[in-house]
């Protein structure tokens, strides 16, 4: 048999040009030999790699794995696989990773950037997820953070809290500014805001400690995320204060196990898996050449009330 005939028989786009009996015979022989098409050669021919690059800043962040899972499941169902890269919150590494994924002919990118001020990827369809890049004009899929923060402040108001503070992460992230701006709009522009250098438990403990040492005499804290909230727990305990008897605390994200801490954390739940699904669907629509669709997709949040909030003391 001519090699060209065998090649056409193995090409899923061309078997109709070859007799069915020949196609079956060639494929049976290929299976017996363990033959698999070379994806690199196929991508050079079709100009499609079958891969999408997914860039995240820190896979140890408990918010990100469910988002990545939603992306992966949706893309796999459409015949695409993910190339996952962790940038360790390093902007230079992020730029290098994006260049490498483009060099590998990724058909698109889904990116959670290390910072809001970094350069946006160019030359390949890109969707931003959870974190925006200033001035990029790229589509963003995220939770409706403002809605969630408003719900947290309203919940505390119902308990009689009037002096509410916001302990949050670094201003280098769009997540921080979205939640901070929503807090100020809901709690008042003079409500104190303290920034930690990361969205971590140690950063939350340090920032909350700064708040307490400043002489703040409030009764409630809206934390920028759940890890910051757990850091606030530690700072309050170190200062001899009890949550929620002395100070109520809310978190944001509803990450795993925050219902198991003491007290169980009242928090804003974001649809983590659904964010990944929506980002993948938006990218697939763009790859298919359809309408560009919305530039911002904000998915609804919900307040989960647990034991860390109570009446103002």
Indicate where each model-derived feature is located.
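N-terminal helix-turn-helix DNA-binding module of bacterial transcription factors
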Residues: 1-47, 313
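Short histidine/acidic/glycine/proline-rich micro-motifs that form metal-
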Residues: 12-14, 58, 88-89, 169-174
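ATP/adenylate-binding site constellation spanning eukaryotic-like Ser/Thr protein kinases
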Residues: 23, 49, 68, 123, ...
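Short beta-strand segments enriched in small/hydrophobic residues
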Residues: 3-8, 45-58, 155, 163-169
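Alpha-helical recognition/docking segments in bacterial nutrient-uptake
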Residues: 47-154, 158, 213
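Short gly/ser/thr-rich secondary-structure transition/capping motifs
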Residues: 33-38, 92, 110-111, 233
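Bacterial carbohydrate/catabolite-sensing allosteric modules
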Residues: 32, 73-78, 127-128, 132-313
